[in-house]
C-alpha cells in the first residue's frame, strides 16, 4: 500500500507525465492492476525470495501479455488513485491475511531424504493427508475415507472440532493460505461413507486374543475400542454416563458439532463388535476387571477436575465450567443474569463464553484473562469465533473479589519473564478496577482427578501423579494404560485418538498382531505437475459449500511435499542449493549445496520446515581446499589425482576415487554421502 500510494501522489503532482518505475510489493495479486495504470517498468524482488517466486513469474507474464494497456504513454492518474485506495483495504495487504504460524517439523535437518509433509507430522494421528487429498481430487472418495479410517477412529467428530494442527503447518502458508484440510475430511465422509459401508466387513474376532476393558467412553475410549476391535480383540467399554461420547457429547456445545455426527462415530465403533456397559459402578477398579477376566485395562476418564477459584466477597453465582456446560447441553442452563464473566482463555473458556451468550437474559459476556491475547491457550479459530459472536475480552486482568452486590474487583497485570512453557508470567500491578457482573464461570485448572485414579488401583508417584510412560501411556502396573486427557492433561480430540492408538500398538506388539496401519502405496502426482502448483497462487478461494469446485481447488493446491519439497532450492537467490536425482534414495531428489555460490543469507533456513539450515547441514561441494578447511559443513572436496576429502558428523576422511567414480575403502557410515559423490562425479565425467 505504501509504494502504490507514493506513486499516486507523484502522478497526481505531475499530471501522469512522470515516468515511474515501480518496485515495492508487486506480486501475482496486483501486477495486472499496476500495469493497467500505465506504470512501466514493474520490477519484482521480494516475491522471488519466497517459495514458488520464480515459477509465479510465468503467471504474471501471462496476465500482462493479455493486457490492452501496452500502448499507454503516460500514467492514468484516476486508475492509479483508485488502485491506491483499494490497496489499503485489500485482504492481501492486511497483516492478519498472512498467518504468523511457522511451518515446523521438529528435529534436525537430515543429510538426505528430507522431504516431509509438515501437515502429517503435526497431526497427532499422522493422518496420510496428501494421499487422501489426492484421492479426493481423483473422485476416489471411498478410498480416501478408507485411508482416513486407518488412523482416525472418529472422522465425523474430527471433521468438525479437530484442532487441525495440520492446517497451521500446511506448506501452502508460504505461498498463499493453508488448505482447508478439516473440511476436506468432512467431505470425504459425506461422499465416501455409503460406498465404504457397503464394502466394509465387521472384523472377525479370535478366541485366542485376550479381552480388553476400557473405562470411559469418550474420544480416547472409543478410539481404543475401535482399534482393538479392528485387530480382533474382544472389547468392553465401561461408562458411568447413560450414553457414550464423553466431553464431546456432554460438554462441548451442540452449536459446535451436531449430535447426530457424534452418534455416527459411536455407532460405527459399536458396529466393530465393541460392547458398552453404561451406568457402571463408580467404584470399578482394575482388580475387579482383572477378576472378570480382562487382561488389559485402558483408563480414559478425562480431565474434568476443576478446582475453581477462591474469591473473596461471597457471591453465590460462581460456576465451574464443566458444570455450566453440562447444564447448558441438557437444556437446563444455570441462572446467569445479564452480565457474565468467564475466567480463563482456553478452549473451554471459549465454549463457556459462546454458550453463555445464548442463555436467555444474558446481554453480554466478558472473558477475563491475566495474560495478553498472544499468550492465550485457546486455538486461534475458537478465539475468533468467540469475537465474532460478540464476546468481549479483558486481557491482563485477574479477578480478586466478587461481592454479593455484583461488584467484581480485578487487578491489572503486567507481563514478566517467560515461564517454563515460554509464556510470559503475569505480574500484579498496583492498579485495580471494578466491573458489574451477575455471574462468573471459572474455566481454569482442568486436570485429571488423581484420587479417583488411586481408588481405581492406578499407582501414583511421590508427586501425587500417576507413574506413566509418556509415549504408550502404560502405567507402572503392567498392561494397565491411561489414555486421552487423563494421561496428557487437557488436550485435543485428535490428541486423544493418537494417545489411544499408541497404547493399542503396544498391546498388539505384545500379542504379536500385525499393526492395522499400513504404509500407503498411492501414485503421487508427477514432479512437473507439482512444480506447476508451486507457481500457482489462489487469489480467491472457492466457497467450501460448492463441494465439487472446493475439492478440485484444494486438491490442485496441495503441494504433496512429502514427494517433492526443494523449497531451499526455490528460494536461494544465488542458486547455491541444487536438487539432483540420485538412485537408491527414498526421495526423488537430494539437495546439494554449492559452497562457492553461497553468501549465507539464510533464506533457505527461513523456509525449511526442519530445525536446521540447508546451507550448513546439506552435503556441500567445495571448490577450493581452503574453503573445505574453513567450513564445518558435511561435504567433500575433490583434488587432482582422485584424492577425495570428505567430512561428516565432524569427522574428516581422506579417500580416493577411481576413473569409474568408485570410492575405495569408505567407512560404512559414509554410505549415503559416497553414493551422492560417486553419482555427481560420474555425471560430471560423462
Question: Predicted segments — roles?
Answer:
Residues 189-205, 264-279, 306-360, 462-471, ...:
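Glycine-rich dinucleotide-binding loop and its adjacent helix/turn
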Residues 684-686:
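Conserved small/polar residues in nucleotide/adenosyl-binding loops
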Residues 483-511:
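A conserved FAD-binding loop/helix module that cradles the flavin
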Residues 316-337, 420-490:
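FAD-site-proximal beta/loop scaffold in flavoenzymes
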